[in-house]
Amino acid sequence: MTEPAFTSFINLAADRLGAETVLCSDDFFAKKENLLKPGRGIFIPGKYTDRGKWMDGWESRRKRTGGHDWCIIQLATPGIIHGVDIDTNHFLGNHPPHASIEACYIQNTKKIKWPKIE
């Protein structure tokens, strides 16, 4: 299989370059930080954690109510996004039917003050 053209660009979401997962709706089964690992996910039969089957990706609990899962990723550096690879390899039967991507550019994130809403 031929790789998409955008894979020749720098991966702005690479943890080795400083990208970080900031927050997510739920990562009970598999941590959000796995989203930033390089390469395709792997599957290891028989490997389990105290929360269930070990998965090399981000996995939340199934929802019994409406809504969706989300994850905020701070890219390593500002840049132009030429493409996104949402790898659901090994998540057969437990993958989203669709996904959306939103982006914003915020300068000086260390100086942002979050007000408490009461």
Label each residue range with its predicted role.
Residues 74, 85-87, 102:
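Residue-level recognition of well-ordered beta-strand positions that form the cores
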